Amino acid sequence: MKEFEKASLILSPLRRAVQNYGMIEEGDKIAVGVSGGKDSTALLCALALMRRFYPLKYEVVAITVDLGLGMDYTPIEKLCADIDVEYVRVETDISKIVFEKQSEGCSLCSRLRRGALHTEAERLGCTKVALGHTKDDVCQTLVMNLFYAGKIEVFWPKNTPDGRNMTLIRPLIYTTEKSVKEFCNKNALPIVKNNCPMDKNTVRQDVREMINEAEKKNKGVNHRIFRAIEKMGIDGFSDFGE
């Protein structure tokens, strides 16, 4: 199996999240949703690597939901071969559906992608679906919902979606975007270029830039937002201390 440098950047916070929230159980078959971006690719590599020493035995399979945007996932397929992980690509026409209904845009795309991912994971007999949302994503989601929807809400670290027989987990919730970037760069991990015309032109991107600017003026803003989420117990988060 491929060796990784600076693996502790990802493995240490990932293992802590997995243990704190009981994300992995003996005999799990975990489907990692791999978009080809840095977060999901780093998550895939970390979960594959952790199989070596984690006390509970589990399997990993990588699933890419191809939106029909002409993106080349060959590098991800090769990476999966290098780390001994089964790779499955699901072809869809989601992009066509989404751009015919532009009023719903990104939210519709997200729902359709998630549905296709869960359906394929169920077909493969998986017990868990892992997504690559980071600590930064948690904070951005809170600010987005507060500013644009008038509610205090984030996504759950671990939950079972309605109508599904498997658990959704987010093992990177303690991992910063900065650590993910450093890990990916250090190991020259393949990142698939996103051909979506909405990439970098979303509300989330605006909020990301807003928080980054606040971080420059007042270091630790991101971490304090995250700690507030934990202390308030929002959507399944718990306060396990610093």
What annotation goes with each model-predicted range?
Residues 1-140, 148-151, 178-186, 236:
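ATP-dependent adenylation/nucleotidyltransferase module used to activate substrates
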Residues 13, 17, 79, 146, ...:
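Residues that form generic nucleotide/phosphate-binding pockets
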Residues 38-41, 67-70, 103-104, 144-145, ...:
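Short amphipathic alpha-helical patches
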Residues 60, 113, 136-216:
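Catalytic subdomain that performs nucleotidyl-dependent activation
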Residues 67, 92-94, 173, 196, ...:
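Residues that form or immediately flank small-molecule/cofactor binding pockets and catalytic motifs
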Residues 96, 131, 195-199, 221:
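Short, surface-exposed helix-loop/turn micro-motifs enriched in polar/charged residues
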Residues 202, 220-242:
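A short, charged, Gly/Pro-tolerant segment at domain boundaries
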